[in-house]
Amino acid sequence: MREKIVVFGGNGFFGQRFVRLASEQGFQVISVSRRGAPQPTEAWHRAVEWVKGDVFSPEDWRLLFENATAVVDCIGIIHQNPSTNQTYQRFNVEIARILVTEARKQQVPIFVYLSAKPFVPFLLKAYFESKKRAEAIIMDVYPNPLIIRPSLFVGKERRGTRAVAQLTKFAHALGLLKKFQPQPVETAARMVLDEMIQKMKTKEVG
């Protein structure tokens, strides 16, 4: 029987890479999001079960946690807009609280949280603080979660991130921002998947 993982944020920039790699590794992958399957449709999408659901309404998706080996939270926003209720507290903290609470109720062995490395804390202080609050909540519920802290993701689909990568190289040449190392999104997704698989093998569950 294949291991089942339930992913939130699976049709995002990072999430699509992650669910694709996980399905290629033989996992039963379920992605929950408001939109369901990404558009336009690609061949690999057939290997993933795309479920429409509101993350703020657990009744939409909690039954999916039955017999799951892992729940993966890769939802998050780096820029907030309080006028539309898109705040760090709501999307980076409250969603983590909802998911980890439901995962614990269903006794899901592994909880994976995509946090963030504070690469430019002086510019995004509130963002990184929200990620830390989410981590604290998760660790209070799951004594041994898998928390990943990547740097900024870059990829060819997002032109803005490519520009950031080029500017970073220039800054490094000048001896600036040495701690800031943008990470290819494909590399990051593979790293998270590898760490999750290792956790499954060693049975270091929450």
Task: Pin down the residues of each PLM region.
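Short glycine-rich anion-binding loops that position phosphate/pyrophosphate groups of nucleotides
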Residues: 77-78, 118, 153
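Oxidoreductase cofactor-interface core, primarily capturing Rossmann-like NAD(P)-dependent enzymes
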Residues: 11, 25, 121-206
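N-terminal Rossmann NAD(P)H-binding glycine-rich loop of SDR-like oxidoreductase domains
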Residues: 4-25
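NAD(P)H-binding glycine-rich loop region in Rossmannoid oxidoreductase-like domains
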Residues: 38, 44-98, 102-105
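Conserved Rossmann-fold NAD(P)-dependent oxidoreductase catalytic core, especially the SDR/UDP-sugar
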Residues: 28, 85, 90-135, 141, ...
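Structural motif
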Residues: 4, 69-70, 110
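Short, polar loop motifs at secondary-structure junctions
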Residues: 32-39
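Cofactor-binding loop segments of dinucleotide-utilizing enzymes, especially the Rossmann-like FAD-
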Residues: 10, 34, 116, 155
